[in-house]
């Protein structure tokens, strides 16, 4: 987790007045959010509040109609494919459904992007993949196929794959929601270790205790807007709005 930043620090991610519509359905309604380097941010809220859409906008997977979104000082514009490619080298994303390639071994899944995108030598790519799999506790699974792994192991491979591009920011979209309860802890422990190592993390999560434990900042989204934002002890301990109090009442214990 990060230490306090000075007021003059330029945010690593700077979002201003972001609006996103699907036809007549406005999903993001003027979102403002600033995230500093090394900060761990958890985004919470009901289903349909815009959490995952916001993450996908940050990664350039979704375009937006109004507002500004800059990453590392560079404005994100959907009509500039080269800029989007550069963005995705620096912004990794882990999805709730793993999205591993079933026909590739675990090691090949982790090696694919550095080989194709960064065109690194194969011996370098392989050594890095082995190192990353060791980092997530799966060094012995290099040659295994995805269908030979548990859901928790597959998600840890997905984390290693996202880290293979050496991203500056890691986006986590409900990374435990598809897992059986007994597998959640192994994935959260890997994410927690990344937070402790200074990775900039932006997480959509329903794991309230985990968010309270690892976050520098918690964002509560409600009906497409940032409704409350603050340090976890403040936001969880003294929610300011009826909407957040109601949400925490049935989501946290």
Predicted feature locations:
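Extreme N-terminus of proteins, especially the signal/transit-peptide cleavage junction
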Residues: 2-11
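ABC family nucleotide-binding domain
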Residues: 10-232
């Amino acid at each position: 987790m990060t230490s306090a930043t000075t007021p003059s620090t330029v945010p690593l991610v700077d979002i201003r007045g972001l609006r996103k519509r699907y036809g007549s359905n406005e999903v993001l309604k003027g979102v403002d959010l600033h995230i500093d380097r090394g900060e761990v941010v958890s985004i919470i809220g009901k289903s349909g509040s815009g959490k995952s859409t916001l993450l996908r906008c940050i990664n350039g997977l979704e375009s937006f109609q109004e507002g500004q979104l800059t990453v590392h000082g560079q404005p994100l514009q959907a009509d500039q494919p080269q800029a989007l490619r550069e963005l995705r080298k620096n912004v990794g994303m882990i999805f709730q459904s793993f999205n591993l390639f079933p026909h590739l071994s675990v090691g090949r899944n982790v090696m694919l992007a550095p080989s194709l995108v960064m065109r690194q030598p194969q011996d370098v790519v392989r050594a890095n993949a082995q190192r990353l799999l060791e980092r997530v506790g799966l060094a012995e699974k290099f040659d295994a196929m995805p269908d030979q792994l548990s859901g928790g192991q597959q998600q840890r491979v997905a984390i290693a794959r996202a880290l293979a591009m050496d991203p500056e920011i890691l986006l986590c979209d409900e990374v435990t929601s598809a897992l059986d309860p007994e597998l959640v802890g192994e994935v959260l422990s890997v994410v927690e270790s990344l937070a402790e190592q200074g990775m900039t993390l932006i997480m959509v999560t329903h794991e309230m205790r985990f968010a309270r434990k690892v976050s520098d900042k918690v964002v509560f989204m409600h009906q497409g807007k940032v409704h409350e934002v603050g340090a976890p002890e403040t936001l969880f301990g003294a929610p300011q709005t009826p909407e957040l109090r109601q949400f925490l009442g049935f989501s946290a214990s």
